[in-house]
Amino acid sequence: IVGTIGKRKIIDRLIAEKKIDVSSVRGKWESFLIQTVDNYLVVAGSDKRGTIYGVYDISEKIGVSPWYYWADVPIKKNNNIYVKSGKYIQDSPKVKYRGIFINDEHPSFASWGREKFGGVNSKLYVHIFELLLRLKANYLWPAMWANAFNEDDPMSPVLADEYGIVMGTSHHEPMMRAHKEYTKRRKEIGPWDYINNKENIDKFFREGLERNKHFDNIITIGTVSYTHLRAHE
């Protein structure tokens, strides 16, 4: 039985019937409880990612490595799987945001993505999202050398949100705008010069924030961008 506290009726019913005590995880960040109740194994997460981590914790313990896809780690096969009666509690992580940056990915990663998935798109990113969650991570700076996460495939940010992955942009991509988004509009926007081109750059930034306002993002704030140039070329 899997569910998030306050989001799934059967979990809330087990709490009301005092079959599970979630006081140690309720309201916490990315925490979960795994407990045997009668003949059931219950996973109750404090929030969305807590629930996901609980499921993947069991998956790893029964023989599925987080790296089964990316590193071809064989999945262990078992004739029987046994669960000891009792309760296991995973507290909130000490580091709130934990993730990776797919940096300087061209040509190797990008070429592989085109060959396997038709591009660095949502079909590829779902495998990255799953890896992050299996590793109990939650944060991603996407590929940006020649890619624009939000524009190349509009399903990519939608799936990130569905999977519970917090998205950001790299150290020289302010306000949720990818490097590639600027380069392909450079004639329209003008020079990366905040002193003399403030109005156009503000508009460019504002559009990025408006586009992503419904998603869980961490926003890079700064004016270094466009091949690491300062905001006055």
Q: Locations of the language-model features?
A:
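Structural motif
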Residues: 2-7, 44-46, 103-104, 143-146, ...
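Conserved small/polar residues in nucleotide/adenosyl-binding loops
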Residues: 227-233
